[in-house]
């Protein structure tokens, strides 16, 4: 490929609305062009990366026994009404009507359609297992699309859906996809980690995320450096930090804390460690009648240590909170505690509340908490002596660095990641809702067990750049770079010798199957080098009159500080060795 035949368009400065590194570099490198909020055209340079990502995915999915199909972007609402997601998904689901006033959706995912296919086509146990996948455009009407391809409204994903006869077989399909994902991300050449994760809105009870490691990642990954334990912070289990509760030493004392409404301020005032304080968070749940009217509101007091943060995902799985909760209103707090937030605690309540203590708080003694009186806190608080035992003790906090690993093999560390893949075991969530059954050996209908497996194809681009860039631009892994090699001839438009050498090398490398670009635009060396460093091509060959007179060319890897000189006759072998490695 020659640059004059391709489309190379770079910018010296990123647009003002580009916020993060990947967004800035993709815009500057001419890989994407903004069309609307969260909607981008993928320009030729960016599309080449997408096609390479898709090719790796296809090869490994096919190798794992999955079968490719293509499901529509626009789907009839009836299928989504069968599962209840037409109403449940909210404004993120784009709903449209056709000229006949029939409801449709623009798909953010395809569980309903693929389950409809399965219930029509997979009638016998002899047809199972089956795994269908497609690579398709999706749309989610994000309230605030941002960060370029990282959180756009229109994007491309690979979705796979497995159908099995029983839970054991579904587990094998899940494991096969988990292994395939490992091979896919290994081939991408990115540093990543597979972590146990919450199933979220998709549903199911087994889930792993594949996270590309990046300091700018939105997700916190909790892992143990001395074992294989890894989980998303939403799911990472927090063990009690003390084996048992200490014997009380201090008396219960109501202590003035004027104007100190945070645990940090109280600890500083009382010259106590923050770990000796307990923070109070007040939630509420509403019971409704068939007409949707609230018939009963229950108030909940959740207690976590002062230096810890509430994990709302964990809290939402507890009895009484599973159906959904909200943070209590100021009026509800005043009615139950008789005090404003900042001084709340479990002692001296005006009305009963349900008390849930984090595991760590349940093992604390002589702790500090709000006194339900403005500008006062209790010190020397002990369970059993000063207040009843909590209604429930549970893991309701986020893990922190240094916590004991749940597998007992060390302590936890935390790094940032960008979710680019997710695998779920769904069970019969969708097959039951849509009556997707097969006939077993006895002719009895049974629900199919399902799994779903997604990879954010376009998101891979942003994640790779967030992980791999420097001051000059993108540093693509070779496997997904738009081109593997760029030939930069100095004076291509002026020197017959340079032109002949460049064309000869281009043809020879192309005949060997290398994916390369010959920059024949006649740009100045500095501008030419800057363009390809910005775009991030892994290997660069520089051909000049001066070098040719010495029988040499320059070869430089994208991450190498300096170019190396080598004989013209050696450059092909050297490139083959580098690209093979």
UniProtKB/Swiss-Prot annotation:
Protein's cellular compartments: Cytoplasm
Keywords: Aminoacyl-tRNA synthetase, ATP-binding, Cytoplasm, Ligase, Nucleotide-binding, Protein biosynthesis
Keyword Aminoacyl-tRNA synthetase set for record: yes
Entry-linked CDD domains: ProRS-INS (cd04334), ProRS_anticodon_short (cd00861), ProRS_core_prok (cd00779)
Substrates-to-products reaction catalysed: tRNA(Pro) + L-proline + ATP = L-prolyl-tRNA(Pro) + AMP + diphosphate
Keyword Metal-binding in annotation: no
EC number of this enzyme: 6.1.1.15
InterPro entries linked: aa-tRNA-synt_IIb, aa-tRNA-synth_II, aa-tRNA-synth_II/BPL/LPL, Anticodon-bd, Anticodon-bd_dom_sf, Pro-tRNA-ligase_IIa, Pro-tRNA-synth_IIa_bac-type, Pro-tRNA-Synthase_IIa_type1
Entry domain remark: Consists of three domains: the N-terminal catalytic domain, the editing domain and the C-terminal anticodon-binding domain.
Family: Belongs to the class-II aminoacyl-tRNA synthetase family. ProS type 1 subfamily.
Protein name, per record: Proline--tRNA ligase
Organism for this UniProt entry: Methylibium petroleiphilum (strain ATCC BAA-1232 / LMG 22953 / PM1)
Gene name tied to this protein: proS
């Amino acid at each position: 490929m020659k640059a004059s035949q391709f489309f190379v368009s770079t910018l010296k400065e990123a647009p003002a609305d580009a916020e993060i590194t990947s967004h800035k570099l993709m815009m500057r490198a001419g890989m994407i062009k903004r069309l609307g909020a969260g909607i981008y055209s993928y320009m030729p340079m960016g599309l080449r990366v997408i096609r390479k990502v898709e090719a790796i995915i296809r090869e490994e999915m096919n190798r794992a026994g999955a079968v490719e199909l293509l499901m529509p972007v626009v789907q009839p609402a009836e299928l989504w009404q069968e599962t209840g997601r037409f109403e449940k998904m909210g404004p993120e689901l784009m709903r449209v009507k056709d000229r006949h006033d029939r409801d449709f959706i623009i798909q953010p995912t395809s569980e309903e359609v693929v389950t409809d296919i399965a219930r029509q086509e997979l009638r016998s146990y002899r047809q199972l297992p089956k795994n269908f996948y497609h690579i398709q455009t999706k749309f989610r009407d994000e309230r605030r699309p941002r960060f370029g391809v990282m959180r756009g409204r229109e994007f491309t994903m690979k979705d796979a859906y497995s159908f099995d006869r029983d839970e054991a077989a579904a587990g094998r399909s899940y494991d096969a996809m988990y292994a395939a994902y490992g091979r896919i991300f290994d081939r991408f050449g990115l540093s990543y980690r597979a972590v146990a994760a919450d199933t979220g809105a998709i549903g199911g009870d087994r889930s792993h995320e594949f996270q590309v490691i990046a300091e700018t990642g939105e997700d916190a990954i909790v892992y143990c450096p001395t074992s294989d334990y890894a989980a998303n912070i939403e799911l990472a289990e927090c063990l009690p930090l003390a084996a048992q509760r200490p014997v009380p030493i201090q008396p219960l004392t109501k202590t003035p804390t004027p104007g100190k409404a945070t645990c940090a301020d109280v600890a500083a005032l009382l010259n106590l460690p923050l770990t000796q304080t307990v923070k109070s968070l007040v939630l509420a749940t509403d019971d409704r009648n068939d007409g949707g009217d609230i018939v009963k509101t229950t108030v909940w007091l959740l207690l976590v240590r002062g230096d810890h943060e509430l994990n709302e995902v964990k809290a939402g799985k507890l009895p009484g909170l599973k159906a959904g909760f909200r943070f209590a209103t100021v009026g509800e707090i005043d009615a139950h505690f008789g005090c404003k937030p900042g001084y709340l605690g479990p002692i001296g309540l005006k009305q009963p509340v349900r008390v849930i203590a984090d595991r760590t708080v349940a093992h604390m003694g002589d702790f500090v908490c709000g006194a339900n009186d403005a500008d006062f806190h209790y010190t020397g608080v002990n369970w059993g002596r000063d207040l009843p035992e909590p209604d429930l003790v549970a893991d309701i906090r986020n893990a922190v660095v240094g916590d004991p690993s749940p597998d007992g093999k060390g302590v936890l560390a935390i790094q940032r990641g960008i979710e680019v893949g997710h695998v779920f075991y769904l069970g019969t969530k969708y097959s039951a809702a849509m009556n997707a059954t097969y006939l077993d050996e006895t002719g009895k209908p049974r629900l199919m067990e399902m799994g779903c497996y997604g990879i954010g194809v376009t998101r891979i681009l942003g994640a790779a750049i967030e992980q791999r860039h420097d001051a000059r631009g993108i540093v693509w892994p070779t496997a997904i770079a738009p081109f593997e090699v760029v030939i930069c001839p100095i004076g291509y438009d002026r020197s017959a010798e340079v032109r002949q050498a460049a064309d000869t090398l281009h043809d020879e490398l192309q005949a060997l199957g290398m994916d390369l670009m010959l920059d024949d635009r006649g740009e100045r060396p500095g501008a030419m080098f800057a363009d390809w460093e910005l775009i991030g091509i892994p290997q660069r060959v520089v051909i000049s009159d001066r070098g040719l007179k010495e029988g040499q060319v320059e070869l430089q890897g994208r991450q190498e500080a300096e170019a190396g000189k080598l004989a013209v006759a050696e450059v092909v072998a050297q490139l083959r060795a580098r690209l093979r490695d």
